[in-house]
């Protein structure tokens, strides 16, 4: 079972870790004794950062990163592919162009599927206050590419926590958090996974403007054996966008 998150005394979900002031983990009998069945998977108690009396403090951070695919297998070029097909006894279709391999496409499917993925993260936090009011505000945005082309994740959140001393005995505090998440992870099925392209041939092209009936996507010119679906067409035309917006307020 997943743990139960208690954020500033209220059950919720995991907060932005940049906003955490302290964290405590309860498990086993201690968690179930206090929170019942909801705490069966453990309880994580979180206290988030609050405003402090003093001069305005600004904390900013920008991170960049890159992720690159490694140890990809070497794929056959058109000339080597045809040589091995003929050596294995496949018939030389006169319309296939195998007699002149140099005239045929030489598609690098690995380059069309994988990429160097860039990651960006921006964080800004402001804290300050006086005897009357204190506040803590933070905002974060990240934009991530995945190493498979046409897949990504964008997300961001904004949080403000403030406390106002109305009188010596009366205080008003509030915490407001809003955020969003937009991702396209490419969910896979039998014909849509990153290993289909290993079965595609270099003589097949990803795009073909003459193939209007097929949406302009390339197809194998000769056929006669399995060349796999056009994986580039699958990546570009099948999207599984997930968009979430959320808000949480405590007072």
Describe these PLM feature segments:
Residues 10-12, 28-32, 47-49, 142-144:
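Short beta-turn/strand-loop junction motif enriched in small, turn-promoting residues
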Residues 224:
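Short, charged, surface-exposed loops that flank catalytic or proteolytic processing sites
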Residues 21, 39-67, 132-211, 235-251:
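Transmembrane beta-barrel strand/turn architecture of Gram-negative outer membrane proteins
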Residues 3-4, 42, 50-150, 186-190, ...:
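Residues embedded in well-ordered regular secondary structure
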Residues 1-29, 61, 136-138:
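Periplasmic plug
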Residues 34-35, 113:
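Short clusters of hydrophobic/aromatic residues that line enzyme substrate/ligand-binding pockets
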Residues 30, 121-123, 248:
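Short structured motifs
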